[in-house]
């Protein structure tokens, strides 16, 4: 029915393109006359356009600036402040509307200008990444359509080789005319620098400046790059700079400006594949015993894993023996189900699953035990030492496993069970024989015991995961004594990224490399919430249509499929399905041999480093020359890709998503059928498979693509094999036979859709959790920025003082304790206030509160008059910033702890998300109260220091600046929707972070100390008598 309607009325994408066609016609009309202009007259056109845009926006910008200046007035009443803020909000909305209006007006003329600029650059030679490149590009009509779509804040899906990089110049140029800065986001730094150097001539022709953010740049260099009209960089660099700006100690340390317009290249990779990995700036946890903890427990885990492997081997042997005589035996099926629960990646089990009827038998046994809400699944698991749920990525110790570990560790089995805190605390409260002090002590013991056991069980769980669910050269590689995660979507090593929640340390212990210390979160934001900061967001990719609903639901981004310049001539064949991996690999090598003999180039796509190296060994055995491109050979990437389209070339590459380089065909290859794409297995995401197919058939070139699949592949094993196995069983397939049918291909795509839906649910859930933090982050960062710019600080402190006076007086008035009030006010504000005891009891508390406010404000104003104005403002700024930074870090730690355990609330029939929102709100209310209280106290108590104290503090600050090198920015790899940040305690020494947090090259904290200065090592001696003795 849907197909009939589409035929009658056209698809959504056809309608989208049809609406833009008149704009394209208008661009081409304006393009013609520009060709006859002289260079000078043509350049003047660009200047005129820029002036036209700026002139239309300057009046509103002036109104905004004037309103902001009025808000700086410390004498404003609360009502006046509110009115001005409302006016400012309306002016900003008006500014965005005016910007959109003027840009739409000049769009046809600007796009025509860019097109003519490209024509004039034809034949010119430029250096791009050290290579000479001749400019030969002028936008086609379909590229103009793509440019309009991007300007409208949508996602343009364009096939590989259709010139996405050139398309981006059109909306980037147009939006850069505003002078507000445009950000172009790429998947890696190589592409950021390459695209900047490649497209720079178009922008520089008309005086627009270009910059690129690279990981090794210092703050002042970054600031200069952000001040350019157009700035390229990776999503993580832009995100980390946002976090660092919100940790800055001065306005001068901040590097970014307005978040106006961002175009995200490979938008699906950035906004979907990386959406589960939050950006985290973390610092070391002092006195962490991570290394000892993992090393101590590791031998126990190795023994329990070996015991489970022996048990699994025994169960498999029994099942194999029974199935020879009784093919449908229930007990044999139960044994195999236990093997599946105990060691799901077992090779012998994978081979047995390819036998007729075995998969069906295991499924029927599992269905039997899953009845009545899986009430009998414990009977399956009780024989095992631990049960593995591969789909959920979880491992549970059984009673048998706990008993095994208690014998190994010579400790009570109860040590591997968490105490029921609630019931134990209730029992203590109900015990009438205990004194109040004894109750407090016993409760503390219960909480301590829970924390210790929880920590040990967590370490055991993470080590078990490391040994059973994470394989070397698949999920990670070990290079130079470090465990590096491999991106499952691109096959690249993710430098600097770590698994969260202790899993990375567990893998380091397993691989016998140095175990890095635990970290604490200093600042964090998810990719989703960072990109929501932009007023306008757009993206381009070759594959977005399959995720269109997610793009719209999460980011409110519409997807428009742009037609190709020439029809796609690639032949996409149905999948070939084999029973075992061995059969599949043999078939792949035979096919490669056949293609080499013919001279047709072939690209073999693999899902892991391990598979790429296995196929490489098999091809070497057949003496077939080939190149391998995976996480271990990434340095040769550009050269390998450049040769992949030549005659007889064989290239094995882990997932080609995000490679960013087109494979151009050599001479005579078109006649052979073009590039042959051979996928060695289906990926979890249809999008990644489409990207691999898209490497062939660029710009109307011929090409072929096919996937070879086996029932032992991860996707088939977890989600898709039952239906396919039953089909193969009915057809009576023997070893070595292959099945090829569109029904099988559709079945595999259904399995992929199932996984995509599951992953979307996880990303959506993560966002729902982070939305709670996002609202809190916005409030805290907004207060911090206000303090950094020293906006109305004195007036705010007076507001805090008024609230404080009312709260504290009311508290002591109710208790009739004037002496207590006097003592607390002196301790917290250093203000002498002695209320008359008889009047205090007789009169309403508001009168005493008024008297206290008068006394405290007089004290504060005396302090102001005694100190220079700039010193007083610095004291206020320091009071606000230092308290916010310390309390925010403590709050992040508490939120980490809350998020870690909130899932357990589901066992009590409670919605974990709702519980999380309620608990997080309570924590946030407490945070704001603490910030206000301690800020007020610090502002009153801080005074300038003597020269001698100054010397000692400077020495400490120099040491602290050196300690800053230990802070790292990490794009954290999340295990699941709820495990996205490390569990760490607070390092109170880091109260005022500076700007050089991620250190890619050596940093000098400041100038070398003088000979009579205190030594920066913190010894207290003079530099000449300590570290400077040899100079």
From Swiss-Prot:
Catalytic function, reaction form: ATP + H2O + cellular proteinSide 1 = ADP + phosphate + cellular proteinSide 2
Region (Disordered) location: 1001-1021
Statement: the UniProt record of this protein carries the keyword Nucleotidyltransferase: no
Domain of life: Bacteria
E.C. numbers: 7.4.2.8
CDD domains: DEXDc_SecA, SF2_C_secA
GO MF annotations in UniProt: ATP binding; metal ion binding; protein-exporting ATPase activity
Sequence positions that bind Zn(2+): 1015, 1017, 1026-1027
Residues that bind ATP: 143, 161-165, 662
A GO cellular component entry from the record: plasma membrane
GO biological process: one example: intracellular protein transmembrane transport
PROSITE patterns for this protein: SECA, SECA_MOTOR_DEAD
Keywords attached to this entry: ATP-binding, Cell inner membrane, Cell membrane, Cytoplasm, Membrane, Metal-binding, Nucleotide-binding, Protein transport, Translocase, Translocation, Transport, Zinc
Predominant location: membrane
Localization per Swiss-Prot or TrEMBL: Cell inner membrane; Cytoplasm
Cofactor annotation comment: May bind 1 zinc ion per subunit.
Pfam families reported for this sequence: P-loop_SecA, SEC-C, SecA_DEAD, SecA_PP_bind, SecA_SW
Entry membrane topology: Peripheral membrane protein
PANTHER family with a match to the protein in the record: CHLOROPLAST PROTEIN-TRANSPORTING ATPASE, SECA INNER MEMBRANE COMPONENT OF SEC PROTEIN SECRETION SYSTEM
HAMAP family, sorted: SecA
Function: Part of the Sec protein translocase complex. Interacts with the SecYEG preprotein conducting channel. Has a central role in coupling the hydrolysis of ATP to the transfer of proteins into and across the cell membrane, serving as an ATP-driven molecular motor driving the stepwise translocation of polypeptide chains across the membrane.
Family stated for the protein in its record: Belongs to the SecA family.
Subunit relationships: Monomer and homodimer. Part of the essential Sec protein translocation apparatus which comprises SecA, SecYEG and auxiliary proteins SecDF. Other proteins may also be involved.
Protein name per UniProt: Protein translocase subunit SecA
Species in which this protein is naturally found: Chlorobaculum parvum (strain DSM 263 / NCIMB 8327)
Gene designation per UniProt: secA
């Amino acid at each position: 029915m849907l197909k009939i309607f589409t035929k009658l009325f056209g698809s959504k994408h056809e309608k989208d393109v049809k609406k833009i066609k008149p704009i394209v016609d208008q661009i081409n009309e304006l393009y013609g006359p520009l060709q006859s202009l002289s260079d000078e007259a043509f350049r003047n056109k660009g200047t005129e356009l820029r002036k036209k845009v700026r002139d239309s926006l300057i009046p509103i910008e002036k109104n905004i600036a004037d309103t902001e200046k009025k808000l700086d007035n410390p004498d404003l009443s609360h009502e006046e402040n509110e009115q001005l803020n409302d006016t400012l909000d309306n002016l900003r909305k008006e500014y965005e509307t005016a910007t959109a209006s003027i840009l739409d007006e000049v769009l046809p003329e600007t796009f025509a200008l860019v097109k003519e600029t490209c024509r004039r650059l034809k034949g010119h030679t430029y250096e791009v990444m050290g290579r000479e490149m001749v400019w030969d590009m002028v936008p086609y009509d379909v590229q103009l359509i793509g440019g309009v779509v991007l300007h409208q804040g949508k996602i343009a899906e364009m096939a590989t080789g259709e010139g996405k990089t050139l398309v981006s110049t059109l909306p980037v140029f147009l939006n850069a005319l505003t002078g507000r800065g445009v950000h172009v986001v790429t998947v890696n730094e190589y592409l950021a620098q390459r695209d900047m150097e490649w497209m720079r001539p178009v922008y520089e022709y008309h005086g627009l400046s270009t910059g690129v953010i690279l990981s090794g740049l210092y703050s002042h260099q970054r600031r200069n790059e952000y001040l350019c009209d157009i700035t390229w960089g990776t999503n993580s660099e832009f995100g980390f700079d946002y976090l660092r700006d919100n940790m800055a100690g001065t306005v001068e340390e901040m590097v970014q400006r307005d978040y106006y317009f961002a175009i995200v290249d490979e938008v699906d990779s950035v906004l979907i594949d990386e959406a589960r990995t939050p950006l985290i700036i973390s610092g070391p946890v002092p006195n962490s015993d991570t290394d000892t903890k993992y090393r101590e427990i590791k031998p126990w885990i190795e023994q329990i894993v070996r015991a489970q492997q022996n048990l699994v081997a025994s169960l498999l042997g029994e099942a194999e023996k029974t199935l020879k005589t009784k093919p449908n035996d229930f007990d044999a099926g139960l044994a195999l189900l236990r093997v599946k629960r105990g060691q799901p990646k077992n090779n012998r089990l994978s081979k047995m699953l390819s036998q007729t009827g075995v998969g069906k038998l295991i499924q029927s046994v599992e269905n039997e035990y899953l009845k009545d809400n899986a009430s009998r699944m414990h009977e399956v698991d009780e024989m095992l030492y631990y049960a593995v749920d591969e789909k959920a990525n979880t491992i549970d110790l059984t009673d048998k496993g706990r008993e095994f570990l208690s014998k190994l560790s010579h400790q009570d089995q109860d040590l591997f069970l968490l105490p029921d805190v609630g019931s134990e605390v209730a029992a203590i409260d109900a015990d009438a024989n205990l004194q109040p002090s004894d109750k407090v002590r016993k409760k503390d013991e219960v909480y301590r015991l829970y924390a210790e056991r929880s920590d040990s069980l967590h370490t055991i769980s993470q080590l078990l995961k490391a040994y059973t669910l994470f394989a070397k050269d698949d999920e990670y590689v070990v290079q130079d004594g470090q465990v590096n995660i491999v991106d499952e979507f691109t096959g690249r090593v993710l430098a600097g990224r770590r698994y969260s929640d202790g899993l990375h340390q567990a893998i380091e212990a397993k691989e016998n490399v140095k175990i890095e210390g635990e970290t604490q979160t200093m600042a964090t934001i998810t990719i989703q919430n960072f990109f929501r900061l932009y007023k306008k967001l757009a993206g381009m990719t070759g594959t977005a249509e399959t995720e269109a609903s997610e793009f719209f639901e999460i980011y409110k981004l519409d997807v428009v499929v742009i037609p190709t310049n020439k029809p796609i001539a690639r032949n996409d064949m149905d999948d070939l399905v084999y029973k075992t991996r061995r059969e599949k690999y043999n078939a792949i090598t035979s096919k490669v041999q056949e293609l080499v003999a013919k001279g047709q180039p072939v690209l073999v796509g693999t899902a892991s480093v391990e598979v790429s190296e296995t196929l490489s060994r098999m091809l070497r055995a057949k003496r077939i020359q080939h190149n391998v491109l995976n996480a271990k050979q990434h340095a040769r990437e550009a050269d390998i890709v450049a040769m992949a389209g030549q005659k007889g070339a064989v290239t094995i590459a882990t997932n080609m998503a995000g490679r960013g380089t087109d494979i151009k065909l050599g001479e005579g290859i078109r006649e052979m059928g073009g590039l042959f794409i051979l996928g060695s297995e289906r990926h979890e995401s249809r999008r990644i498979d489409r990207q691999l197919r898209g490497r062939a058939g660029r710009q109307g070139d011929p090409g072929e693509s096919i996937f070879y699949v086996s029932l032992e592949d991860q996707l088939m094993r977890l989600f898709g094999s039952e239906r396919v196995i039953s089909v193969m069983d009915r057809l009576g397939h023997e070893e070595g036979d292959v099945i090829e049918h569109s029904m099988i291909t559709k079945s595999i795509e259904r399995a992929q859709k199932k996984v995509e839906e599951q992953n979307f649910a996880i990303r959506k859930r993560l966002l729902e959790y982070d939305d709670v933090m996002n609202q809190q982050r916005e409030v805290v960062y907004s207060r911090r920025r206000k303090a950094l710019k020293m906006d109305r600080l004195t007036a705010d402190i007076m507001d805090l003082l008024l609230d404080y006076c009312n709260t504290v007086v009311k508290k002591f008035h109710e208790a009739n304790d004037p002496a207590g009030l006097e003592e607390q006010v002196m301790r917290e504000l250093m203000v002498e206030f002695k209320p008359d005891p008889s009047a205090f009891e007789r009169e309403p508390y508001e009168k005493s509160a008024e008297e206290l406010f008068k006394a405290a404000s007089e004290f504060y104003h005396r302090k102001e008059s005694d100190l220079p104005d700039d010193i007083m403002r610095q004291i206020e700024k320091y009071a606000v910033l230092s308290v916010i930074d310390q309390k925010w870090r403590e709050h992040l730690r508490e939120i980490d702890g809350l998020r870690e355990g909130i899932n357990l609330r589901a066992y009590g029939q409670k919605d974990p998300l709702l519980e999380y929102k309620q608990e997080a709100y309570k924590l946030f209310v407490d945070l704001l109260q603490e910030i206000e209280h301690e800020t007020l106290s610090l502002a009153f108590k801080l005074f300038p220091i003597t020269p001698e104290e100054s010397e000692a503090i400077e020495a400490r600050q120099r040491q602290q600046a050196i300690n800053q090198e230990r802070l790292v920015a990490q794009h954290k790899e999340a295990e699941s929707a709820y495990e996205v940040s490390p569990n760490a305690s607070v390092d109170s020494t880091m109260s005022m972070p500076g700007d050089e947090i991620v250190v890619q090259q050596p940093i000098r904290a400041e100038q070398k100390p003088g000979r009579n200065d205190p030594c920066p090592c913190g010894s207290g001696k003079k530099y000449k008598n300590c570290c400077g003795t040899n100079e």
